[in-house]
A protein has these predicted regions:
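Conserved short alpha-helical segments that host acidic/polar catalytic motifs at enzyme active sites
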Residues: 1-172
Length: 172
């Protein structure tokens, strides 16, 4: 999970391994760290540690992805050939979320960066970016991993599974 506190202009992040455990039991002890956050993103991933928090010329942002990138190794090598580096490895392999972030940051805007991602990857990727200005949701261009936007009086929510929206009084 990652949250942004506008008053403190600070990102908070917490990553937990959810194997053999429920989400709530892992995150409940750390929820107090998110006090004052007015927006947040999160994902449950079997492969990549996320969210990542990035500082770039676009500004600071947190990113989560749901992705299956078929040309991951090829793209990683291209980035290494451009003198880029990878700090996050997942089981000794390139973290897909970090690779996506490295494809975003050459853009002049977040939207241009996301378009760059979709031009380069083979496969699918949906993502949420938490910026200092809000959340950007980008669905994979093939629709394999959907993003549904819910709305209620005091805010919005984005998810890949809309079943919780009814319980939380969000309208699709």
């Amino acid at each position: 999970m990652a949250g942004y506190n506008k008053e403190e202009k600070a990102f908070t992040r917490s990553i937990h391994n959810l194997e053999n455990s429920y989400f709530r039991t892992k995150f409940e002890p750390t929820l107090s760290r998110f006090q004052g956050c007015t927006s947040g993103i999160g994902v449950i991933s079997d492969t990549d540690a996320q969210p990542l928090v990035i500082n770039s010329h676009l500004g600071r942002f947190a990113i989560v992805t749901v992705a299956k990138i078929q040309n991951l190794d090829e793209l990683a090598q291209q980035l290494l050939d451009q003198n880029m580096h990878f700090a996050e490895l997942s089981s000794g392999k390139t973290n897909q979320t970090e690779l996506i972030s490295l494809l975003i940051i050459p853009g002049r805007t977040f939207v241009e960066g996301i378009e760059n991602v979709f031009r380069h990857i083979k496969g699918s990727c949906s993502m949420l970016l938490l910026t200092e200005d809000g959340i950007i949701a980008a669905r994979d261009k093939w629709g394999r991993t959907p993003i549904v936007i819910g709305r209620k009086e005091d805010g919005f929510a984005a998810t890949s599974e809309s079943t919780a929206f009814d319980n939380l009084d969000y309208q699709i």
